[in-house]
Amino acid sequence: MASPLLHLDGVTKSFGKVTVARELTLSVQPGEALGIVGPNGAGKSSLFAMISGDLRPDSGAVWFEGREVTAVPPHARTRAGVGRTYQVPRPFEHLTVFENVLVCAHQGAGLKGRQAWTHSMDVLDGTGLADLANTPAGRLTLLQRKRLEVARAIGTAPRLLLLDEVAGGLTEPEVVELVEVVKRLHTEGLGIVWIEHVVHALVKTVGRMVCLAGGDVVADGEPMAVLADPKVRELYLGGGPETGLTDEEGS
């Protein structure tokens, strides 16, 4: 088996008496698409922050492509090949869609001149935003802003893409559109870790799913097997249909 693209080795993080990651060990293989689910407060956002460098674990180590990056700051991890989105898109609203991606190509991927321009246009083509290239980001719909958030992350030329609740707030047809974008990126060989409450979007996209609760891994495996796990179903009791644990959404 190839060396993991990402490996978390016994990572622990606490805020006062609240532990958001407890000796958590997790690996992602090159080109793998992993979905992460769990109730609010499960430690999902903290996990992403430790992978991206926005948060440093109290103990344990984070490895990327065989190199320990536990103490590496976020901008350096981006340059190393880790791209991420945020739950609330915050593009440069006064810049066009193209300019938003171009900034990421310059600053995140270190691309210059024609290479940066070509890369940015390719990213817009791949995320369905080419027709909006000259549109100011402040005029975009929510779905378009979500697409731009993904495009900005892809603009940094990552080998690992962290998606943080990108389907949240979208209508079902919009979720379907976004899933197609993510699927396309995955088929190009990009490693993906996707946190999402709209779980049926994950089922249609990822090959593996992890459920977190209280900073621990509760279940890890094929998506439908994880969602059928009694421990996982207990966590989601009363969660409503948006949890994606119904047969209709899981099909």
Regions found by a protein language model. Give the residues of each.
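Glycine-rich phosphate-binding loops of nucleotide-dependent enzymes
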Residues: 2-251
